[in-house]
Amino acid sequence: MAFTNTHMRSASFGIVTSLPDDIIDSFWYIIDHFLKNVFELEEELEFQLLNNQGKITFHFSSQHLPTSIDFDFNHPFDPLYPPRVLVLDMDGRETILLPEENDLF
C-alpha cells in the first residue's frame, strides 16, 4: 500500500515555480490527515485545483476508489495555478509534480 512508509518528500521544479509553499504543504497535510490509513492509496494520486469563490479547493479522486473528496482551504485561488497535480510514491520517496513532468520520474 502506497504512502505508508515515507522516507523523503519533495516537490518538482514545475511545482515549486507554480505554487506557493503553503499550497504545496497542503497536499502533504491532506494526505497525512485525511487519506493515509483511511483509503488504500495507489502509488500515483491526482488532485485538481479548483476555484471555490476565490478560495482553493483540492479535488481528490481515484479510478480505484468509488469516492471523490473535495478539501476546501482558505488559501486564495490563483487562475495561474496548474489545474492538475500528481503526487507519486516511489518506494517511500514521495514527490509532488505536474502531470507533464511524470515522464521524468
Where does each model-flagged region fall?
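N-terminal "domain-start" segment
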Residues: 1-73
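Short, compact, well-ordered microdomains
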Residues: 62-105
